[in-house]
Amino acid sequence: MAMATSFYCSTAIPSKKTNQNRENFLCSPVGGSKTTPSYIRLSTRQSRTLSLVVSAAASGAAVEAEPKFAAVTPSKILSFRVGHGFDLHRLEPGYPLIIGGINIPHDRGCEAHSDGDVLLHCVVDAILGALGLPDIGQIFPDTDPKWKGAPSSVFIKEAVRLMDEAGYELGNLDATLILQRPKVSPHKEAIRQNLCQLLGADPCVVNLKAKTHEKVDSLGENRSIAAHTVVLLMRK
């Protein structure tokens, strides 16, 4: 019997082919998607039959694969899911500055299609990301006039509904605001409490931090505001 050795392992290779206990796997979009394929376990006989079907189809013959080959393995349900969200908006005179649903006094605010709440937007994206769903811009496109000037609490409530529908609850949330001015510390607790209320979460699982950008680039020059959020979702 010939032996093949690699850096990782040593595997015995039989001198002749054998069909004993042979299994084949077919990657198919049935029950999955183009980006998340499902795997179908085929016996040797089924594999040969399917090869004939594919060959016949390639030659132009009208042949249909039997449905019994489309049995798929159910998706694994995860106990925990982690998501990250990021958002940034320009700061312009004449707009309100709303952070976490709280109106913050300032000489400029966020220019955006909705109310421009950078914190709530990135929280929504973090939840959607953890659930493996499209981002906030796809679910609430800025090309849709019905979201013009909409309060971001609408987006948060929809994200919470989707989370609940998927069978998950918030384990914890950690958010970071990045802006040069104004100082967030006088308003931080009000922002956090409102965020907890919108999420239906205990305050002990929601954390909020604020950082300046050391007067570097648009964030440090009071021309923009940004936020990052990480969430942990737990299976109910």
Swiss-Prot record:
Pathway: Isoprenoid biosynthesis; isopentenyl diphosphate biosynthesis via DXP pathway; isopentenyl diphosphate from 1-deoxy-D-xylulose 5-phosphate: step 4/6. Keywords: Chloroplast, Isoprene biosynthesis, Lyase, Metal-binding, Plastid, Transit peptide. Homotrimer. The keyword Lyase applies. This is 2-C-methyl-D-erythritol 2,4-cyclodiphosphate synthase, chloroplastic. Belongs to the IspF family. Its EC number is 4.6.1.12. Its cofactor is a divalent metal cation. The record marks 113, 212 as: Transition state stabilizer. The lineage of its organism: Eukaryota, Viridiplantae, Streptophyta, Embryophyta, Tracheophyta. It is an enzyme of class 4 (lyase). Converts 4-diphosphocytidyl-2C-methyl-D-erythritol 2-phosphate into 2C-methyl-D-erythritol 2,4-cyclodiphosphate and CMP. GO terms for biological process: isopentenyl diphosphate biosynthetic process, methylerythritol 4-phosphate pathway; terpenoid biosynthetic process. Binds 1 divalent metal cation per subunit. SUPFAM superfamilies: IpsF-like (SSF69765). It comes from Catharanthus roseus (Madagascar periwinkle). It is found in: Plastid, Chloroplast stroma. The gene is ISPF. GO terms for cellular component: chloroplast stroma.
